[in-house]
Amino acid sequence: EVFIAVADFTVPKSGDLHSAGVPPVTLRAERRVAKFRVLLKDKPSPVNGFSFDMTAHTVQMLLTSKTEPFAEGIDALGGMYYGDPALYELPCCMSTMGDFHSSGTERYQMCQTNSTVFSPFVFADPASELPIGIVDIDISGASGGYTYKTDQTFARTLAASKISGIVFETTDTYDDSSSQIRIDVVEATDDAGNPENAAALFDPFYEWNASSY
């Protein structure tokens, strides 16, 4: 949790420039981080019955973001010289607890605050939002059990004091060329076929406190 509090106030002065004391000032602290939530849905695949086991899973992924060009100097004609847009890459590793938690009629594993590796958060400016890409997703469970992967790229937006995220479910597609079967996962959908909203499935207070004090 990272909160920032800023306030403008006037320091009164007496006639001889000594301070007459500062009146009470109220500071409102606001969260300056964005949270990213990963959920694993307990939904067996239609044919092979693949699912996530009731064990802690390690989730690894790469968050990417293209930044705006910035002025690096002045060119020969006196104009500003802008470099090429950069690409930020943030490797993330988190773990779920082994238990499933109910939301509506479905069950999910999530990265809880007391897990071995915490869910990631990113410092965020309340005045703007940050589009990100999610790539290189790899999920592993218990030793000797399944591992899970996807080659898809997912797009999300991070914003201060808000939770973004993604819900994964298993498919029937797998690779058994190694000692551990690797099962393909996709973004989970609801009964209507719409992508599930990770932020809406659980109360935000599950992971953090009130947005301000």
Q: Which residues are covered by each model-predicted region?
A:
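Tryptophan-paired
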Residues: 1, 45-164, 202-213
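Short stretches within intrinsically disordered, low-complexity N-terminal or propeptide regions
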Residues: 7-9, 78, 88, 190
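Beta-strand secondary-structure signal
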Residues: 24-26, 35-39, 134-136, 165-167, ...
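Generic structural signal for short, flexible, solvent-exposed coil/loop and linker residues
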Residues: 25-27, 155-157, 169-174
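Intrinsically disordered, low-complexity repeat and linker tracts
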Residues: 169-213
